[in-house]
């Protein structure tokens, strides 16, 4: 049975994001993935601040200065017979809710681990978010051109700490200065590593068969024998790859390589297009939407300001769930009930924009937004329903924002509300005073906000510490008890950017006591958009 042209397009799509701890090599791997997808001819590695060659996916001004990727950009490239959408996620020492939310818009994740360090804190946090939807995970053990930890130990650590089985697909031969290449367990082939070839795609020498004397000649007898011994152990002790368990998020195929040396990335990409799911169904408040449905649906997971420094516009990123987008199409924005004609949707290659004529499930569209689109908005061809599972996360860090020029209060509030709508920060306005408190998941968000207030809204602000430890969204079915709660806790209540009532607690102890005192009030850690 041949698929219809529409279903053929759907089947070709793979949409994934990369999760890693800062400095595990995520930006480098992004570069190399794009190189293999021939989206860029030479991978511009991220060098120090003075370098003129900036990595393709780090593109706001602050990112250029710091060498870190702050905004989640989207890159689409062809690979074999597939079209791959890679959603880049902020991965430096500080990241934001954008990173969490981007993981709700993909069908698969690539986890990049620094093989010298193993599982690190950020990787754990991001894996927890992928667990909300049992997202399938591929794993790339990076930096084999450095001295690494024992590979068996690394697999054990992933299994024990992240509670996911490991199925090695390739296995390393040596590491650091002695790194010779990897052996593919399922193809019975050894791929030999050459140094100094990191910027372009090279022909790799392949040795067929584990017992081929050419292998001993190529890597030396000692390493060849060590490989055979290790593989006996590996095949006895680790999981075999099973596609069903992978799709259920229970096991992860593991690849070894060095992104900087451009080695092993193609093996991982081959696995991604072969095994990662085509666009998946998604839940709404009324039903499940299948990617095979021909009527258009999509949801907004991120809003980015000022992608074009020459224009003060904002772009909403929408994941297509079903149906085909065509230029000039009329779509209903469910939250407002308004029909809008989308004539100029964009597709991206990190900051380079091009207009899209058509898009399919799994693709990401950029919609011009003049303040009318919010995170979590659903677009359909008329059906009134809302996609679920795109949450706001309670901030973990808080600062008070103060103006250098008190006359600019209005611009400040406008700027903060707009920044909160796009998820750059959350803003809270205490009911009992005129303070403005911003909440974030990571510290750098505060610097980003101050820098953007200045460059986009011409408002000079500084932030200072504030006595807030945590925040919870509050609601209650019992109107009378809720009124009493509000009356007695006025000094701890604030409205967020969307005017939702929030309890801001000075300490965790205070929060726990208040929750005990008011059992009829719900204190929520996440809030659906």
UniProtKB/Swiss-Prot annotation:
PANTHER family in alphabetical order: PEPTIDE CHAIN RELEASE FACTOR RF3 (PTHR43556:SF2)
Chain positions recorded as GTP binding sites: 20-27, 88-92, 142-145
Record-linked NCBIfam families: prfC, PRK00741.1, small_GTP
Chief location category: cytoplasm
Purpose: Increases the formation of ribosomal termination complexes and stimulates activities of RF-1 and RF-2. It binds guanine nucleotides and has strong preference for UGA stop codons. It may interact directly with the ribosome. The stimulation of RF-1 and RF-2 is significantly reduced by GTP and GDP, but not by GMP.
Protein name: Peptide chain release factor 3
SUPFAM superfamilies assigned: EF-G C-terminal domain-like, P-loop containing nucleoside triphosphate hydrolases, Translation proteins
Record gene name: prfC
GO BP of this protein: regulation of translational termination
GO-annotated molecular function: GTP binding; GTPase activity; guanosine tetraphosphate binding; translation release factor activity, codon nonspecific; translation release factor activity, codon specific
UniProt subcellular location: Cytoplasm
PROSITE patterns documented for this protein: G_TR_1, G_TR_2
Record bears the keyword Acyltransferase: no
Gene3D superfamilies: P-loop containing nucleotide triphosphate hydrolases (3.40.50.300), Peptide chain release factor 3, domain III (3.30.70.3280)
Stored InterPro entries: EF-G-like_DII, EFG_III/V, G_TR_CS, P-loop_NTPase, PrfC, RF3_C, RF3_dom_3_sf, RF3_GTP-bd
Keyword Cell membrane: no
Residue ranges of every copy of the tr-type G domain listed in the record: 11-280
Keywords tagged on the record: Cytoplasm, GTP-binding, Nucleotide-binding, Protein biosynthesis
Listed GO CC annotations: cytosol
């Amino acid at each position: 049975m041949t698929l219809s042209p529409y279903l053929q397009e759907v089947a070709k799509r793979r949409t994934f994001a990369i999760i890693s701890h800062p400095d595990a090599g995520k930006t480098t791997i992004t570069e190399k993935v794009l190189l293999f997808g021939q989206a860029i001819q030479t991978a511009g590695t991220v060098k120090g601040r003075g370098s003129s060659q900036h990595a393709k996916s780090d593109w706001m001004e602050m990112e250029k200065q710091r060498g870190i990727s702050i905004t989640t950009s989207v890159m689409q490239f062809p690979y074999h017979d597939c079209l791959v959408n890679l959603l880049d996620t902020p991965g430096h020492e500080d990241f934001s809710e954008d990173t969490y939310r981007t993981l709700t818009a993909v069908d698969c994740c690539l986890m990049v681990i620094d093989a010298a360090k193993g599982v690190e804190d950020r990787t754990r946090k991001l894996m927890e978010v992928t667990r909300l939807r049992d997202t399938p995970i591929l794993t790339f053990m990076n930096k084999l051109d450095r001295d690494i930890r024992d590979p068996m130990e690394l697999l054990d650590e992933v299994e024990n700490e992240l509670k996911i089985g490991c199925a090695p697909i390739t296995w390393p031969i040596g590491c650091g200065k002695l790194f010779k290449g990897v052996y593919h367990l399922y193809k019975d082939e050894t791929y030999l590593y050459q140094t100094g070839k990191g910027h372009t795609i090279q022909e790799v020498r392949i040795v067929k068969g584990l017992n081929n004397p050419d292998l001993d000649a190529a890597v030396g007898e000692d390493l060849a024998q060590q490989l055979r011994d290790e593989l006996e152990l590996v095949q006895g002790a680790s999981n075999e790859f099973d596609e069903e368990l992978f799709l259920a998020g229970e096991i992860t195929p593991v690849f070894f390589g060095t992104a900087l040396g451009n080695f092993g990335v193609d093996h991982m990409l081959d696995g991604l297009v072969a095994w990662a799911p085509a666009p998946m169904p998604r839940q709404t408040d009324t039903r499940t939407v299948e990617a095979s449905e021909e009527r258009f649906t999509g949801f907004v997971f991120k809003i980015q300001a000022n992608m074009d420094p020459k224009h003060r516009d904002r772009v909403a990123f929408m994941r297509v769930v079903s149906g085909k987008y065509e230029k000039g199409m009329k779509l209903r924005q469910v939250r407002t009930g308004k029909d809008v004609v989308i004539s100029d949707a964009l597709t991206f290659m990190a900051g380079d924009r091009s207009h899209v004529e058509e898009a399919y499930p799994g693709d990401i569209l950029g919609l011009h937004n003049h303040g009318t689109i919010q995170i979590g908005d659903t677009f359909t061809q008329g059906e009134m329903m809302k996609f679920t599972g795109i949450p706001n996360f309670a901030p973990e860090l808080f600062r008070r924002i103060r103006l250098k020029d008190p006359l600019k209060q209005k611009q400040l509030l406008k700027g903060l509300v707009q920044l909160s709508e796009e998820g750059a920060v959350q803003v809270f306005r205490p009911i009992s005073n005129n303070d403005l408190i911003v909440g974030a998941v990571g510290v750098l968000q505060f610097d980003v906000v101050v820098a953007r207030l200045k460059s986009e809204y011409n408002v000079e602000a500084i932030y200072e510490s504030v006595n807030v430890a945590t925040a919870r969204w509050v609601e209650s079915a019992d109107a009378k008890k809720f009124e009493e709660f509000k009356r007695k806790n006025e000094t701890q209540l604030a409205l967020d950017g969307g005017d939702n009532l929030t309890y801001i607690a000075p300490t965790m102890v205070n929060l726990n006591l208040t929750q005990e005192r008011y059992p009829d009030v719900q204190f929520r850690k996440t809030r659906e958009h």
